[in-house]
């Protein structure tokens, strides 16, 4: 399992894309998340997936995907809590909205297995217990469960 995350725009070289493709086609999993739901990182990651796997499409996993269930020894994460900064109109204190949602995980399937798993919402800061009022992502407990499911699921494919 190769884990990458970030918050800024990035670009891989042709050699890096080729090495990543070889790793994934050899059975590896690329697991990525966008720190604090950074749109810059998410756009860069999606572009790099199009360039690395031009014949594949990174698409959102459906709600009924086995990854979100406990069927394989993971957690039932079909509903999780997403923290989202509340918009402020004045100088009032910052607030967080907590929404019950289905996890947003995008994936690429190769030969019938999940080869790339990407969360456009933050997982890693929550896993590090770095909670910020400006950070859009899953609460710590749910981030741990979603991340665990990705790892457990990948190891059983």
Language-model features: locations:
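Aromatic-Pro/Gly-enriched surface loop or interdomain linker
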Residues: 1, 5-9, 123-157
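Short alpha-beta junction capping motif
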Residues: 3-42
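Mixed-charge, polar/low-complexity N-terminal
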Residues: 4-5, 10-11, 89-91, 96-98, ...
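Sec/Tat-exported extracytoplasmic proteins
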Residues: 6, 28, 49-60, 154-157
């Amino acid at each position: 399992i190769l884990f990458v995350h970030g918050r800024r725009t990035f670009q891989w070289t042709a050699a890096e894309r080729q090495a990543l493709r070889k790793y994934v086609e050899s059975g590896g999993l690329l697991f990525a998340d966008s720190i604090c739901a950074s749109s810059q990182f998410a756009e860069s990651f999606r572009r790099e997936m199009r360039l690395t796997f031009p014949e594949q499409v990174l698409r959102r996993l459906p709600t009924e995907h086995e990854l979100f269930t406990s069927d394989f020894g993971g957690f039932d994460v079909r509903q999780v809590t997403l923290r989202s900064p509340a918009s402020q109109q004045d100088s009032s204190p910052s607030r967080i909205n907590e929404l019950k949602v289905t996890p947003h995980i995008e994936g690429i399937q190769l030969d019938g297995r999940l080869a790339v798993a990407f969360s456009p919402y933050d997982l890693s800061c929550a896993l590090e217990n770095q909670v910020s009022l400006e950070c859009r992502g899953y609460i710590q407990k749910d981030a741990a469960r979603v991340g665990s499911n990705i790892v457990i699921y990948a190891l059983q494919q």
